[in-house]
């Protein structure tokens, strides 16, 4: 009887200790996160190691420890820490991104490619992993890179960086459509992003490239119905470009394009064009086009436009801040 009571006492003490340890591990983890935010990775490593000792199966702690080693440029330790995470049932696509950053810093390109392919096999709908794999193979195989970025757009249409890379890739090819489509989608997904000003310039140049030919459909070899419909509709606006391309002309061309696109119910549904239609109806389409092209094409003219259209610009800016652009999963046409 005494033995049984002793055993029960030990069990009770163990059960009481376990939650305390778990809580302590979480408290330590939060402390370490504060150090990470401050850029104090030495202290973060110190605290995370203690936290992981209490909760060795906590993959979130292990990921942060690997990242802290990475930022300290202790890549061997970082790799040792992240590898068990990759093989665990709790691995997520972020785990593979962290490991990828470590392999990049170690300049182990072959391992990097294998890692991302392994990650995609486990997470076939991860836009970030397709994007990273595309960037990893770009130097050796641009064709493979664009395939991965396209797959990323198809699998995870809400992730922006595949659009960015794909738009830049197509700009340096004979393609006339997808730089414009993907570039504008990226800008709407990241309206204040660091890459957005450069993408706006690419978009402006892409429209100039599009209207170089008098007949936009003439040399089109793409049998894609979306592309054919796009070029056919845009071709009707070619005469408007006789005086060149600028923000005002593009606003006119694109307004007419949207009206024509929605004139019948035969064109494919497309979120970007639906946004254009909404802005037209609400009287903000010119403000949107000025935001998209104005500052890039002529900064002083854009600043003057903002002054003379203050109410329109304010209304658009408020809308821009309140919305989030996300492409639907069923509107991939390439």
Residue ranges and their predicted role:
Residues 50-51, 84-85, 118-119, 151-152, ...:
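Canonical positions in the second alpha-helix
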Residues 158-334:
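Eukaryotic alpha-helical solenoid repeat scaffolds
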Residues 38, 72, 106, 139-140, ...:
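Structural motif corresponding to the intra-repeat A-B loop/turn of tetratricopeptide repeats
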Residues 64-67, 97-98, 132, 165, ...:
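Canonical tetratricopeptide repeat
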Residues 61, 95, 129, 162, ...:
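TPR alpha-solenoid repeat register
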């Amino acid at each position: 009887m005494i033995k049984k009571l002793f055993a029960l006492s030990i069990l009770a003490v163990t059960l009481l200790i376990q939650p305390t340890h778990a809580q302590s591990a979480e408290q330590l983890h939060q402390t370490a996160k504060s150090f990470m935010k401050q850029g104090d990775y030495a202290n973060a490593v110190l605290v995370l190691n203690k936290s992981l000792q209490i909760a060795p199966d906590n993959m979130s702690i292990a990921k942060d420890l690997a990242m802290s080693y990475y930022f300290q440029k202790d890549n061997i330790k970082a790799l040792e820490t992240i590898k068990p995470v990759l093989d665990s049932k709790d691995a997520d696509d972020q785990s593979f991104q962290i490991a990828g950053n470590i392999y990049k810093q170690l300049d182990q390109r072959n391992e990097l490619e294998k890692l991302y392919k392994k990650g995609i096999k486990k997470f076939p709908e991860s836009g970030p992993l397709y994007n990273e794999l595309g960037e990893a193979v770009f130097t050796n195989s641009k064709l493979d890179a664009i395939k991965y970025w396209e797959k990323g757009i198809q699998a995870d249409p809400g992730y922006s960086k595949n659009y960015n890379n794909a738009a830049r890739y197509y700009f340096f090819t004979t393609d006339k459509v997808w730089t414009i489509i993907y570039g504008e989608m990226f800008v709407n997904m990241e309206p204040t992003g660091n890459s957005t000003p450069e993408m706006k310039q690419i978009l402006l140049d892409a429209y100039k490239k599009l209207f170089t030919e008098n007949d936009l459909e003439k040399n089109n070899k793409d049998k894609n119905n979306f592309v054919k419909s796009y070029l056919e509709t845009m071709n009707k606006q070619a005469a408007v470009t006789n005086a060149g391309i600028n923000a005002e002309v593009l606003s006119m061309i694109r307004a007419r394009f949207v009206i024509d696109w929605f004139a019948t119910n035969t064109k494919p549904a497309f979120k970007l064009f639906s946004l254009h239609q909404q802005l037209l109806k609400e009287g903000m389409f010119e403000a949107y086009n000025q935001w998209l092209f104005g500052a890039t094409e002529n900064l002083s003219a854009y600043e003057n436009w903002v002054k003379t259209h203050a109410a329109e610009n304010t209304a658009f800016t408020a809308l821009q801040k309140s919305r989030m652009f996300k492409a639907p999963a069923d509107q991939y046409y390439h």
